Amino acid sequence: MIQIDTIPKELQSIQPFVRRFNELEAHNPVIAYWSLYWAAQMALSSSHGVSNECKDFLLSLIEHLEDLRKNLGENENVSDETSAKAYVESFSLEVLVQAERNSKNGKPDVQAYLAARDFLELSRIWGPPTEQITKSIKFCKLRALQVANPQRKAKTPSNHATEELQQSSTNSTTLPTQEAAVETNASASHETSFALPTTSPAASLSISPTKSAAVSSEPNVEADVKSLSSTPAAPQLNSPSHSYEPTTFPSTTSITENLPTIDPTRSTRSSSHIQSLSPESKQTSDGHRPPSPTSITTTSTSIDPSVAFSSKSTLATTRTNAPLSRPSQPTKASPLNKFSALEAIQSARSHARYAYSALDYEDTTTAIHHLKSALKLLEEEEQGNHTAD
């Protein structure tokens, strides 16, 4: 591990990459190696005219890099240029994809976007980055600024993440198109503190917090950050991705009690009987239908469905708080001897179903009444059979 505070002031621009090296040295030595390699290359490019302190630090950095290279041996993601570039870009894009997932899940992390930015910068080792990598780098900076903006209002200026963002720069706010991350080379997969996306939806990105701010080597930092912060087209992380409207419920005064009916929250066992309770399916032998339950609005009692089947029943006067929508005339049921045995059994079944439905509402009085009516029909039908015999 390289102590950040030992980096000379003239080489502060390499801090982010030294920090990534410290974070991944024990978990992903390949990415750690390339992070330190890029830090050394940046330091060498700016070593002209530096102090002896900087030269000593640079020599120790190169020695550390050589030791790490020996430990990696013949790893193709280090020895082979094409494989190394593909592996670094794949890892970088995976970190960015995971940062976006966390943001969409309501857990945006500034450090996740900053880490993705640093890893994407490593592609410069093999020449100018592609257009997609360039857009992804700018996208990381923009997203990090969007996450940090509300935090900067509540935190002191000494906040390290805010300081690092203020030193980041960009010349464009063009967002990259969504592309799937390149699959990581299986031969060089390592356990890493940056949890890579997997098939499991519970995969998460864990980035160790840093203790100091990174200094960008790009010019006009403050102006670029200001332009990023005021970009009108920038998406807001904190805004909800979906809009839900409250469910509209009907007024309780407009609900009519239709007995018997099945509460939609009841079990499927009880709901299976509702289809057989339709009044249109029940008809007496003289052509009269039982009064429809939906034609009556009541708050205290209900019309007895047995009037269509009983030989002695008449329509009882009910106490209601609302007028009858269609007054029913008292019906005279046909004598039982005009019923066929099949019709009597069917009528008894209807009473039993009404009783069953009434029990769903714990209306034992109605249930008992219909059960008695069903038993009476069956007893009279049985008595008629004995008489005929």
From Swiss-Prot:
Any Pfam family matching the protein: Vta1
Under the heading InterPro entries, the entry gives:
Vta1-like (IPR044538), Vta1/CALS_N (IPR039431), Vta1/CALS_N_sf (IPR023175), Vta1_C (IPR041212)
Q: Which GO terms describe its cellular component?
A: endosome membrane; multivesicular body
Organism's domain of life?
Answer: Eukaryota
Which keywords, in A-to-Z order, does the entry hold?
Answer: Cytoplasm, Endosome, Lipid transport, Membrane, Protein transport, Transport
Chain's role: Has a role in the formation of the multivesicular body (MVB). Required for the sorting of lipids to form intralumenal vesicles and for fluid-phase transport to the vacuole. Required for sorting several plasma membrane proteins into the MVB.
| Name of the protein | Vacuolar protein sorting-associated protein vts1
